[in-house]
């Protein structure tokens, strides 16, 4: 076959397969058999392999999966992916309607209602009609680049019907039938099954090997247009029609409503129809349809005023409470958990539910053997709602909390003003294990690859008993553990070694000193600069620091007034763990050449590691200016948790947005 003929046939096959994909995955109206589709796909793959010069990034053949990735790169969203406020009942919906009408002087308002797909929110970027990048929502400001995995989803067009540049947003999901099939295969292979379709979709999309995602039969509904060049959109319903014309899959079950009564009727209708869908939904999204009215209403600090998400009531089921087990946390708090006869709740099998503390058990009169009502709080955490007293037989047993720790047999105490029982033995194995999990966590020593499962294995193998023991681990020890190979063992040893270079505040937070969070740990580290100086500090010296109260100061002094802790710090020194502050102090920033010099910066949302007042001082010390509102003259918005209206303003004025992690990286350069 000549090159010219091969090129022509490749183009014919691509057009043909794109048409087949659109008919099957978007229109749900296949025109050919699976066998014919596969035959054409194999011919295309063969021709492209023989003629690599004709390979294209938007060829249907890329949907079978490409190169295995090492990591997912971070992506900063051009416009933040905001969350929505929630409504839980009819009253909440009417309150929303009243707020909307007050905000627009009771002008005529039309709502558009859509099913809230229970999947993974993603953004899709197209340049002149070609799919160039896809990303997860992440924290709303920064997500992960999952382009290669999204290319395997056949409902996502690789080339649009127009050469337009835009960003679309939607929900990737796994159909129920695909979920059942996947779990059946995993069970047959002796693998852990997914709890629900949402977890399956998220787990599939975040596979580093796109070939795995390609096998999972994922789909996607596009629900919004974040921005589009050279086109004016007047309403949300118009944007959905436009997206459909471009070749996207939009959900057909949307409806425009003229009154809140029509909205409520739509909600009730889909609450009934919900079980009959082939995909999971967890509510209804209601939006003001008119874009001009959306802009007039604006946003709050957390969410747009023109939209709300109605959450379906949590499913409640009845099951029998067969026992109560206890767990000990890293601070010694002993928490009771109900053991239940297995029951399906909101798509997952539930065997345990939180009982929180002894007072709750007494208040609800929960006894072993009771029939209880269980639901998932926020559709996530199982909890016991109440006891069905009319089902009691008299054989149920009252439960009494133990007087001694279930892990170490030390006497339990109830501290003043606390409802929880607590083990105060510093050598309690359960506390040590939970403390180790905290020590290696992201905001502490951030040791990649060392999660709860591995910590448990190391603990059970008696390889670690203290934080310092982590730094004596060898590759040979790791190779003795389940699921560890040469590469993973080498990587973990290196990750542990790298953590020695962390700045002091990470180590302080990782130690788990009571009342000391990430922000306080940074305050102490910057103030004292070394661990030795902090250890010697008195309660009065600690209380003299801004935002450090008496309770925290007493806790820090008590923590370091312990021979075991001092021995631990000595071991850290011997292993070469850094115990000095590596960040810059405000006094040191005056003569530093900085990104922030001459820049106007806006801080919004809650900053976890560094408070906004401290961040403001540092930016100003570096020659920057911090203002309270976003305008055309703003150079940067730093967005913490629950940032809202200022993000929308940043998008309007095309201002760059950083999350806290990116901000700290720049500060510490």
Curated annotation (Swiss-Prot):
Reactions catalysed according to its record: NAD(+) + (deoxyribonucleotide)n-3'-hydroxyl + 5'-phospho-(deoxyribonucleotide)m = (deoxyribonucleotide)n+m + AMP + beta-nicotinamide D-nucleotide
Cofactor: Mg(2+); Mn(2+)
One GO cellular component, as annotated: cytosol
Protein name: DNA ligase
Occurrences of domain BRCT (ranges): 591-669
SMART domains hit by this protein: BRCT, HhH1, LIGANc
GO molecular function, one term: DNA binding
CDD domains xrefs: BRCT_DNA_ligase_like, LIGANc
Signal peptide per UniProt: none
List of residues binding Zn(2+): 405, 408, 423, 428
């Amino acid at each position: 076959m000549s090159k010219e003929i091969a090129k022509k046939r490749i183009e014919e096959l691509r057009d043909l397969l794109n048409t087949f994909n659109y008919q099957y995955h978007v229109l749900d109206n296949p025109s050919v058999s699976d066998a014919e589709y596969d035959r054409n796909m194999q011919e295309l793959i063969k021709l492209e392999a023989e003629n690599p010069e004709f390979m294209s990034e938007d060829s249907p053949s890329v949907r079978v999966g490409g190169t295995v990735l090492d990591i997912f790169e971070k992506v900063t969203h051009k416009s933040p992916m905001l969350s929505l406020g929630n409504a839980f009942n009819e009253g909440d919906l009417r309150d929303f309607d009243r707020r909307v009408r007050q905000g627009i002087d009771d002008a005529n308002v039309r709502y558009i209602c859509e099913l809230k797909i229970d999947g993974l929110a993603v953004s899709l970027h197209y340049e002149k009609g070609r799919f160039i990048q896809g990303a997860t929502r992440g924290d709303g400001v920064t997500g992960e680049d999952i382009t290669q995995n999204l290319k395997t989803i056949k409902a996502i067009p690789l080339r649009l019907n127009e050469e337009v540049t835009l960003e679309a947003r939607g929900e990737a999901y796994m159909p129920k039938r695909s979920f059942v099939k996947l779990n059946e295969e995993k069970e047959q292979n002796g693998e852990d099954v997914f709890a629900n379709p949402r977890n399956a979709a998220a787990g599939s999309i975040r596979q580093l090997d796109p070939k795995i995602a390609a096998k999972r039969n994922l789909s996607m509904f596009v629900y919004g247009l974040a921005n589009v060049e050279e086109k004016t959109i007047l309403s949300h319903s118009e944007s959905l029609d436009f997206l459909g014309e471009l070749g996207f899959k939009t959900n057909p079950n949307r409806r425009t409503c003229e009154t809140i009564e029509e909205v409520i009727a739509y909600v009730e209708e889909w609450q009934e129809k919900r079980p009959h869908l082939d995909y999971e939904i967890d509510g209804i999204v209601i939006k003001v349809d008119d874009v001009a009215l959306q802009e007039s209403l604006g946003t709050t600090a957390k969410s747009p005023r023109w939209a709300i998400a109605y959450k379906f009531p949590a499913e409640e089921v009845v099951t029998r409470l067969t026992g109560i087990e206890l767990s000990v946390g890293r601070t010694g708090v002993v928490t009771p958990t109900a053991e239940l006869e297995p029951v399906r709740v909101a798509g997952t099998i539930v065997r345990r539910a939180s009982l929180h503390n002894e007072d709750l058990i007494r208040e609800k009169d929960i006894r072993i053997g009771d029939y209880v009502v269980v639901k998932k709080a926020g559709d996530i955490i199982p909890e016991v709602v109440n006891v069905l007293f009319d089902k009691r037989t008299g054989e149920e047993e009252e439960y009494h909390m133990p007087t001694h720790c279930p892990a170490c047999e030390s006497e339990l105490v109830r501290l003043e003003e606390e409802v929880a029982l607590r083990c105060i033995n510093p050598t309690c194995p359960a506390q040590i294990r939970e403390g180790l999990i905290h020590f290696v966590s992201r905001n502490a020593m951030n040791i990649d690859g060392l999660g709860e499962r591995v910590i448990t294995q190391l603990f059970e193998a008696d390889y670690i008993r203290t934080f310092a023991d982590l730094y004596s681990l060898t590759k040979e020890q790791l190779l003795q553990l389940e699921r560890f190979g040469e590469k993973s063992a080498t990587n973990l040893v290196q990750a542990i070694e790298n953590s020695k270079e962390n700045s002091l505040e990470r180590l302080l937070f990782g130690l788990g000193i009571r009342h000391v969070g990430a922000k306080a740990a940074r305050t102490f580290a910057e103030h004292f600069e070394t661990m030795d100086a902090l250890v010697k500090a008195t309660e009065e010296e600690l209380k003299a620091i801004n935002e450090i109260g008496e309770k925290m100061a007493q806790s820090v002094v008590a923590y370091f007034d312990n021979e075991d802790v001092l021995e631990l710090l000595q071991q850290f020194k011997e292993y070469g763990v850094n115990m000095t502050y590596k960040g810059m102090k405000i006094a040191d920033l005056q003569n530093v050449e900085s990104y922030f010099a001459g820049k106007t910066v806006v801080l919004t949302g809650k900053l976890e590691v560094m408070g906004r007042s401290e961040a403001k001082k540092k930016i100003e010390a570096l020659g920057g200016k911090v203002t309270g509102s976003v305008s055309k003259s703003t150079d940067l918005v730093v967005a913490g948790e629950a940032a809202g209206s200022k993000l929308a303003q940043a998008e309007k004025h095309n201002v760059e947005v950083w999350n806290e992690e990116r901000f700290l990286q720049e500060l510490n350069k």
